[in-house]
């Protein structure tokens, strides 16, 4: 089996058009920067993996990639779990959560990509095999305060072939009317997801706000209600889960299986949204 020869990081930036005011709970996002990790083996073949949040943590990612590169150079490319343990063991004092785990995730993905190329197998065959022939995907946007703008954007997604649309909440007191207007426009042509975006916001709502919202949204039969409270607020999730019949989704910023274990044991999620490179 070939060995790791080099690990590099590349950044690809897309500046948003000036007329696009992309606000979210963390503030204004002016561009999208993707961090791609490239692992090259001793045969000159390579695999790619992605690190999320590169637009916020550009410089730290560069240093972390260099740190882990020094540990992994010379390792056989098939020793993916061993690579994870080496990286975690070298950083456990300061890296139980956060962007360093995300960089480890990107390296993990790149190793799988490279191994799949060497074995001429898709990665899903390397991690247990095919589960479903088809899966539904959704268009994710919906940061709008007016029904007109929301429906216009959702129609664009519909014309592109999407049949599920995710909208995000800007103000909790406007969301029910937006959902009502969306359902009036699309009826059964398009399903809807509502993201409260409370998992990462600096000043989350009180639990009762999300509980009341969930109760109001039940009659609109949305697919799921995403991140109705801060991700570390497991007691809040328990309270919300008990109060509604809606499917509750979250966990996209819970970085490891160890960190997710208490959520799994508490059964607070109907839909788990792991992001393995966060």
Per-range role (PLM):
Residues 128-244:
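Metal-dependent enolase-superfamily TIM-barrel catalytic cores that perform enediolate-based chemistry
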Residues 40-118:
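Metal- or metallocofactor-binding catalytic centers and their adjacent structured scaffolds
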Residues 1-48, 52-53:
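Structured beta-strand/loop patches that form or line metal/cofactor-binding pockets in enzymes
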Residues 4, 37, 44, 68, ...:
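Conserved, mostly hydrophobic/aromatic
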